Amino acid sequence: MPVTDSIADYITRIRNAGNASNKTTDIPYSRLKENLSRLLVEKGYIKSYTVITSEQFPFIRIDLKYTDSGKPAIKEITRVSKPGRRTYEGKDLKKYLGGLGLFILSTSRGVLTDKEAREQGIGGEVLFRIL
């Protein structure tokens, strides 16, 4: 089945794997998804990721992170900018929940968090929010 919104598919696979208490999930590869995974590892929302290219189609294997009580580290992950309605923010981007969560942006300088974008004084497309 073809996917029209690959970022929404990425988010949904992570959310569903966390809700099902799976240790890993596989996601079709793209450079954007690899950069998103790298950012989520840096911010502590997922344990690690591995790009696997031995198959016919490359994919990313994400190792999910859980709290000591067994709950997913990602409490909420929601798509903001959608194919039918793109959402862009300027350099005066507001904090998500007063800084408790993050907005993930696609900018001219790559994939950044809202904090990094504010520090660099740039805006971009708000891909999703995560708590």
From Swiss-Prot:
GO terms under cellular component: ribonucleoprotein complex; ribosome
Alphabetical keyword list: Ribonucleoprotein, Ribosomal protein, RNA-binding, rRNA-binding
PROSITE patterns linked: RIBOSOMAL_S8
An individual GO BP term: translation
Alphabetized Gene3D superfamilies for the sequence: 3.30.1370.30, 3.30.1490.10
Keyword Mitochondrion set for record: no
Keyword rRNA-binding set for record: yes
GO molecular function per UniProt: rRNA binding; structural constituent of ribosome
Stated family: Belongs to the universal ribosomal protein uS8 family.
Function of the protein: One of the primary rRNA binding proteins, it binds directly to 16S rRNA central domain where it helps coordinate assembly of the platform of the 30S subunit.
NCBIfam families on file: PRK00136.1 (NF001109)
Subunit note: Part of the 30S ribosomal subunit. Contacts proteins S5 and S12.
Name of the molecule in the record: Small ribosomal subunit protein uS8
Name of the gene encoding the protein in the UniProt record: rpsH
